[in-house]
Amino acid sequence: MSVRILVVDDDRAVRESLRRSLSFNGYSVELAHDGVEALDMIASDRPDALVLDVMMPRLDGLEVCRQLRSTGDDLPILVLTARDSVSERVAGLDAGADDYLPKPFALEELLARMRALLRRTKPEDAAESMAMRFSDLTLDPVTREVNRGQRRISLTRTEFALLEMLIANPRRVLTRSRILEEVWGFDFPTSGNALEVYVGYLRRKTEADGEPRLIHTVRGVGYVLRETPP
């Protein structure tokens, strides 16, 4: 059964972007547009984690945190906010948030922080079973280890995020814009060849010993992870 995450933000574009990204990565996602709706949804069907904006109408994110913690609820909470001062971060943590992420942010970082929050609430053996595999390629989001067969591959943060997205969606064609949004974040570049450059890096590293290519170009669309060319 997939992990259920409740995303609470009054900005519809942010809600939908997070829904797409989290769903793409195997989470079951529900949406709320303010704190009152969020508390009602949590009371009726408690999720596994909460992604919570601070500035919202009716009931803001900090008050949601306070109300949950006052009842003894230890639901993992990741707070999002456009304010990034020390005092704002302290206020969020003091209200009961487990982690704090300022906007704008890279979706890659939000996913990493969510994995870290969930690891804290799961037994050790559950965390150890998160390795992702395709063909002879293995990626572990917990240890951040990547292997092609028995060969260890060292990746940068961006290379890892790109490969993680591909391996989470085997044989599914991912559009260029979708990859840019998820790996580079909301302020992703609309021009330039950053994506092509990083795909080239990944290919060189995953094919360094002459292994067959797994990352293929779908001309005019994007990229796909599969055993044979599309």
From Swiss-Prot:
Keyword Transcription included in the entry's annotation: yes
Chief site of localization: cytoplasm
Organism of this sequence: Mycobacterium bovis (strain ATCC BAA-935 / AF2122/97)
List of residues that carry 4-aspartylphosphate: 48
Alphabetically ordered keywords of this record: Activator, Cytoplasm, DNA-binding, Phosphoprotein, Repressor, Stress response, Transcription, Transcription regulation, Two-component regulatory system, Virulence
Any one of the GO CC terms: cytosol
Name of the protein in question: Response regulator MprA
UniProt xrefs under Pfam families: Response_reg, Trans_reg_C
Entry keyword DNA-binding: yes
Function comment: Member of the two-component regulatory system MprB/MprA which contributes to maintaining a balance among several systems involved in stress resistance and is required for establishment and maintenance of persistent infection in the host. Functions as a transcriptional regulator that recognizes a 19-bp nucleotide motif comprizing two loosely conserved 8-bp direct DNA-binding motif repeats separated by a 3-bp spacer region. MprB/MprA up-regulates expression of mprA and pepD.
Subunit composition and interactions: Monomer. Interaction with each conserved 8-bp repeat requires tandem binding by two protein monomers.
Residues in the DNA-binding region annotation: 129-227
UniProt gene name: mprA
Molecular-function annotations in GO: phosphorelay response regulator activity; transcription cis-regulatory region binding
